[in-house]
């Protein structure tokens, strides 16, 4: 009875929601036009940046050293910290920002890549009549619209499908999604809609067909998170903020307030991580925007302060692009343990995640095999049984730490806030914590408002609504065509440059090397499967990239797309960076080692490679073992029991295939488990066993050897009696 009432109530609410949405559609269209006009007006009110290009890191450090006192010093170069710096500097405040690692090196680069209002939070707001959750959704939807407007090259609307497997869920979820559209109002990207079972399968052919009723499609935003964070920091630098990465805060400076006699935070002792040099940076106001490390800085101010951050780890995996449609994501609203899983196309790959597990705060979070397998199992539940979801198809994996917080001023100290908290300590340290990527701008605005009030700073109102981020102002969807026409770039590379750098893509194109081919004329790729080119390494240094890890993970996104491809590109990236930054051989070796450790531990290479180790079980039929042994011995002509690069080169030359030595080294290195420069028979059999089981998606060596064997077999001499007679 209760169930029937619930369903009837849902349908009644659905009817009301439909009438309301239809009735307000014309009004929403009118309001959207007004909002667009407001964006134009806001952009016109903001003065041009002080610098056409961001100053060099060396120039920024000199500014930090030589400025007697800043108005605001921001600690933390993630999305929120960079947003605070941009908000402060565009209000006319003398602003500095320091980050102990690279911009976006923490949580801000390890997100689900969505700019969303939070459908789940709206559900909680309605079910629990929670006004705070409603306000959070309303704010996030406004910020979503703003972010899509100010960085159109880095973001775009994305349709997300919600498959429905029980008939009563259709009106239930439809009402919820329509309310999501309604709350968005003039900020609604596109109206949600219902799909029949057949239409849903047209869009997503791999979807589980059994018991599928239909689907609901709604719209949220998607972005390139690390590049977005970098664009915010670079925009702040262009407007005059002294921003420096690899600048660690060692301690907070304090001085006695002559009026109250109390100690006040007055700056920070900073250390250049790259040189070891230490110096003081003084400021009227210090802002702690360090995400998961919030309490570390708070304890520098007061060692007895109560911790407010409750870190939670969210793991994501990347799979080949064929696992999802190119232009539509999928949402599993209720996993086996009550979590939500997204399945999204991104950069021609597929992202699946996330988990939500309590964790310790660390600079180097590692994705666990347990979390990776949990996500794979949830993916299997939603895909057709005809599709084999294999562990070996995980191309990269990462863990990001969410800085969930409790409000120190709240009576309920155990209640975790999904919203942000701005706290001012007795000594004047301002802490901004919590929140989410989408609302970084409003979080920054709230923080600077609090700073202006608490420290009597002379500043204008916030000017960041409608303020274009670097690369966004003169971007257009057809900009890539000019890159192809003017510079002779491949279309795929040109599209990538336009979507990564916006109107700054022309500067990257100018740096591109000549290929020596008829086409493309310029743009030498770092790895053949991805559109990243060597010129991006040189340009990345202008964007404050200081290490090889910066380049493979945040200037390019190779590490987040395919760890093996990133590892292959590393030697060339280090060589190019070494030329620009005058690295000696020792420094180059150090960079290679550090970057490989990063890929191995933090980006899932460890989990991926552990699927094939020296202890891997060889589970092959005797006939298979025999076949693979014969293939192996065609290369090991001297019966040594192993093959080297020379053996492979000899066989390839005999069938007329040319391959450069560096590529061959990379191919052998994938299978050389004990790293002795030789691939032994047992290593090769382990590889073939792992490929058959689906633990490893494939191997270039395995494909190469099979192709060579087939070509060699074709060259067997024809018997005389079958040669049409006669010699």
Swiss-Prot record:
Keywords: Calcium, FAD, Flavoprotein, Metal-binding, Mitochondrion, Oxidoreductase, Phosphoprotein, Repeat, Transit peptide. It catalyses: a quinone + sn-glycerol 3-phosphate = dihydroxyacetone phosphate + a quinol. It comes from the Eukaryota. GO terms for molecular function: calcium ion binding; glycerol-3-phosphate dehydrogenase (quinone) activity. One of its GO terms (cellular component) is mitochondrion. The modification Phosphotyrosine is found at residue 601. One of its GO terms (biological process) is multicellular organism growth. Ca(2+) binds at residues 672, 674, 676, 678, 683. Pfam families: DAO, DAO_C, EF-hand_7. Gene3D superfamilies: Alpha-glycerophosphate oxidase, cap domain, D-Amino Acid Oxidase, subunit A, domain 2, EF-hand, FAD/NAD(P)-binding domain. It is found in: Mitochondrion. Residues 1-42 form a transit peptide. InterPro entries: DAO_C (IPR031656), DAO_C_sf (IPR038299), EF-hand-dom_pair (IPR011992), EF_Hand_1_Ca_BS (IPR018247), EF_hand_dom (IPR002048), FAD-dep_OxRdtase (IPR006076), FAD/NAD-bd_sf (IPR036188), G3P_DH_FAD-dep (IPR000447). Calcium-binding enhance the activity of the enzyme. FAD binds at residues 71-99. Its EC number is 1.1.5.3. It is an enzyme of class 1 (oxidoreductase). Pathway: Polyol metabolism; glycerol degradation via glycerol kinase pathway; glycerone phosphate from sn-glycerol 3-phosphate (aerobic route): step 1/1. Residues 623-658, 659-694 form the EF-hand domain. Coiled coil: none annotated. Its cofactor is FAD. Calcium-responsive mitochondrial glycerol-3-phosphate dehydrogenase which seems to be a key component of the pancreatic beta-cell glucose-sensing device. PANTHER family: GLYCEROL-3-PHOSPHATE DEHYDROGENASE, GLYCEROL-3-PHOSPHATE DEHYDROGENASE, MITOCHONDRIAL. Belongs to the FAD-dependent glycerol-3-phosphate dehydrogenase family. This is Glycerol-3-phosphate dehydrogenase, mitochondrial. The lineage of its organism: Eukaryota, Metazoa, Chordata, Craniata, Vertebrata.
């Amino acid at each position: 009875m209760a169930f029937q009432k619930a369903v009837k109530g849902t349908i009644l609410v659905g009817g009301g929601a439909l009438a309301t949405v239809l009735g307000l559609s014309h009004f929403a269209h009118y309001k959207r036009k007004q909002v667009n006009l407001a964006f134009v007006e806001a952009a016109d009110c903001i003065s041009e940046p002080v610098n056409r290009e961001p100053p060099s890191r060396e120039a920024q450090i000199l500014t930090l050293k030589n400025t007697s006192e800043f108005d605001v010093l921001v600690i933390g170069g993630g999305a929120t910290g960079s947003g605070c710096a941009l908000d402060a500097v565009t209000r006319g405040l003398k602003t500095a920002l320091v980050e102990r690692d690279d911009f976006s090196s923490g949580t801000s680069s390890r997100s689900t890549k969505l700019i969303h209002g939070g459908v789940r939070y709206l559900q909680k707001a309605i079910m629990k009549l929670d006004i705070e959750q409603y306000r959070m959704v309303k704010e996030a939807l406004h910020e979503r619209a703003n972010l899509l407007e100010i960085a159109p090259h880095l973001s775009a609307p994305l349709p997300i499908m919600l498959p429905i497997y029980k008939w009563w869920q259709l009106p239930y979820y439809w009402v919820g999604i329509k309310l999501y559209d309604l709350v968005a109002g003039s900020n609604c990207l596109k109206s949600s809609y219902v799909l029949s079972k057949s239409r849903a399968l047209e869009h997503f052919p791999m979807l589980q067909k059994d018991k599928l009723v239909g689907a609901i499609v709604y719209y949220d935003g998607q972005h390139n998170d690390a590049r977005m964070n970098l664009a915010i920091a670079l925009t702040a630098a262009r407007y005059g903020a002294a921003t420096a990465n690899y600048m660690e805060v060692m301690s907070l400076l304090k001085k006695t307030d002559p009026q109250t006699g109390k100690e006040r935070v007055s700056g920070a002792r900073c250390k250049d991580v790259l040189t070891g040099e230490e110096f003081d940076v003084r400021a009227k106001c210090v802002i702690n925007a360090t995400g998961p490390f919030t309490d570390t800085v708070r304890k520098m101010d007061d060692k007895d302060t109560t911790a407010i951050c409750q870190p939670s780890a969210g793991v994501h995996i990347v799979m080949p692009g064929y696992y999802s449609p190119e232009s539509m994501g999928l949402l599993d609203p209720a996993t086996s343990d009550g979590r939500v899983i997204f399945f999204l196309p991104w950069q021609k790959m597929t992202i699946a995640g996330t988990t939500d597990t309590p964790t310790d705060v660390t600079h180097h979070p590692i994705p666990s095999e347990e979390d990776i397998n949990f996500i794979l199992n949830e993916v299997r539940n939603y895909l057709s049984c005809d599709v084999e979801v294999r562990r070996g198809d995980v191309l990269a994996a990462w863990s990001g730490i969410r800085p969930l917080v409790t409000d120190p001023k709240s009576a309920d100290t155990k209640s975790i806030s999904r919203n942000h908290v701005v706290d001012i300590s007795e000594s004047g340290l301002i802490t901004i914590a919590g929140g989410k990527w989408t609302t970084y701008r409003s979080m920054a605005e709230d923080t600077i408002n609090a700073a202006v009030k608490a420290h009597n700073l002379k500043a204008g109102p916030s000017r960041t609504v409608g303020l274009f981020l670097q690369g966004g102002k003169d971007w257009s969807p057809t900009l890539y065509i000019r890159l192809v026409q003017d510079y002779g770039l491949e279309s795929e590379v040109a599209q990538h440059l336009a979507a990564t750098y916006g109107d700054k893509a022309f500067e990257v194109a100018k740096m591109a090397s000549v290929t020596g081919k008829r086409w493309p004329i310029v743009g030498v790729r770092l790895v053949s499967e991805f559109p990243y080119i060597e010129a991006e390494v040189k340009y990345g240094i202008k964007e404050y990239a200081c290490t090889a890890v910066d380049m493979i993970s945040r200037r390019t996104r190779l590490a987040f797309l395919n760890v093996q491809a990133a590892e292959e590109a590393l030697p060339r990236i280090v060589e190019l960076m070494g030329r620009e930054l005058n690295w000696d051989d020792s420094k180059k070796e150090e960079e290679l080692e550090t970057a490989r450790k990063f890929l191995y531990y933090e980006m899932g290479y460890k989990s991926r490679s552990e699927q094939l180790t020296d202890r891997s079980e060889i589970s092959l039929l005797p006939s298979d073992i025999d076949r693979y042994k014969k293939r192996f011995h065609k290369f090991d002509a001297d019966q040594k029991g192993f093959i080297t690069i020379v053996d492979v080169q000899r066989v390839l030359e005999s069938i007329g295939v040319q391959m450069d030595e560096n590529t061959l080294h990379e191919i052998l290195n994938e299978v050389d488990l004990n790293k002795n420069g030789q691939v032994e028979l047992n290593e090769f059999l382990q590889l073939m066993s792992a490929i058959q089981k689906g633990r490893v998606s494939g191997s270039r060596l395995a494909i190469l050897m099979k192709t060579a064997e087939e070509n060699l077999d074709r060259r067997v001499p024809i018997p005389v009696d079958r040669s049409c007679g006669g010699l």
